[in-house]
Design a protein with these regions (language model features):
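Catalytic cores of nucleic-acid endonucleases
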Residues: 87-145
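Generic "edge-of-domain/loop-turn" microfeature
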Residues: 72, 83-85, 151-153
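Glycine-rich, aromatic-bearing surface loops/beta-hairpins
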Residues: 127-206
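Amphipathic alpha-helical segments
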Residues: 39-56
Length: 206
């Protein structure tokens, strides 16, 4: 996962760009919130394409930040956390999206099939793995956690990997299968949700 570490910086920069753009337009805060995640996603995708040409993770969607690793063939799509629950976002109401949220449980290393990489090396074949990168921004700082979700209805995950912005720190993480509990990310609420709640409280008091 060390190759994904630039995603933290790129996401933060994209978010900052979107906030700056909003200052030049005239929409309600509700309209901004509806479009903000989509705009951040698109800018993140475009930045990754431009800045990470030599990265093994390549963009595979014309509109969204959906990536695939050329070495292991693993896929990843990035989505904001559910602002109402602070948890992993639900899948879109499509067959393909639900399929990505219903995967086989995590296998021990010895049972993972192998394949030949483009460089001719023997590598794990993770072509059937789809990760969901759930992100939030708090005070301008991004938090991203990668999940392998195995139950679309209950949002159960068998793997949770915090994504760090530093390759050295990321390489030190030892990945272990997560308890198959409902995946929630407590205490992570994005900026717009906090600001919206404060605004609502002020209006109610007024």
């Amino acid at each position: 996962m060390t190759e994904l570490t630039p995603l933290i910086r790129i996401l933060e920069e994209s978010y900052a760009d979107v906030l700056t753009m909003e200052k030049t337009q005239f929409f309600s805060q509700g309209q901004y919130r509806l479009k903000r995640a989509e705009n951040v996603n698109m800018r993140t995708r475009n930045r990754w394409n431009l800045e990470q040409e030599n990265n093994t993770w390549k963009v595979v969607d014309p509109n969204y930040t959906h990536l695939r690793d050329e070495v292991t063939r693993m896929r990843m799509e990035i989505h904001p956390i559910d602002s109402r629950t602070g948890g992993v976002p639900k899948p879109a109401n499509t067959v393909a999206a639900r399929a990505r949220y219903n995967q086989h449980k995590c296998l021990p290393a010895e049972l993972i099939p192998e394949n030949i990489s483009p460089d001719g090396e023997l590598v794990p074949d993770l072509s059937n793995v789809n990760l969901v990168a759930a992100w939030t921004i708090v005070d301008g700082h991004a938090t991203i956690t990668l999940h392998k979700i195995i139950d679309a209805k209950k949002l159960k995950s068998c793997l949770d990997i915090p994504l760090l912005g530093n390759r050295e720190d990321q390489s030190k993480i030892r990945y272990e299968a997560a308890p198959e509990n409902e995946m929630l990310i407590p205490n992570l609420i994005d900026e717009e949700t906090k600001h919206s709640e404060k605004k609502t409280e002020a209006e109610n008091k007024g």
